[in-house]
Amino acid sequence: MKEVEVLVKVLSKKNDVLDILNKFNFIGKKKVLDIYFYDEKRDALKPKEGKLTECFRLRKKDKNNYITYKIDYFDDAGTWIYSDEEETQVNDFRVTTKIISHLGLKPLIEIDNIKHTFLTNEYEIVLEEVKGLGLFLEVERQNITKTENISEVKQKI
């Protein structure tokens, strides 16, 4: 699935941002743990200049667990444009972690956060409280068609 998103650090207070976001359709608040993995033997899953071109993620979202393979696309200047993601649900977080380890993937980073999700007609808007890093706002549009200009979609966001 092709998605286009914009992620920015939030400098305002959480309650001030939530007051503004509450005019949209509130979907819910979820605790999310993301563990990103890399493979020392595969160039695509190694950090390059502080960026990943591809990554493998294990996510715990409330009581559900998911594995995701994500491919990021960048413009000629190295600016992230969009991602393609393949994701599926898995049952057992602990067993999945062991399988990933047996495959030789190494944990790169863990991101522990609380996500407040809102919807509009076109966008998913998420206020993220990231442990140790602060507040972030993500605005995402999914299901981008092949004929749409990614830069124009991103500019509209």
What do the PLM-derived regions correspond to, one by one?
Residues M1-E122:
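N-terminal strand-loop-strand beta-hairpin
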Residues L7-K9, E138-Q142:
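Active-site ExK catalytic segment of metal-dependent nucleases
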Residues Y66-T68, V126, E138:
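General beta-strand recognition
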Residues K70-D72, G132-E140:
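Residues forming anionic-ligand binding surfaces in small-molecule and nucleic-acid pockets
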Residues D75-G78, G134-F136, K146-T147:
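A short local loop/turn or secondary-structure capping micro-motif enriched for an aromatic residue
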Residues E124-G132, Q142-I144:
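An amphipathic alpha-helical core segment
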Residues K146-I157:
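Mixed-charge, glycine-accented linear interaction segment located at domain edges/termini
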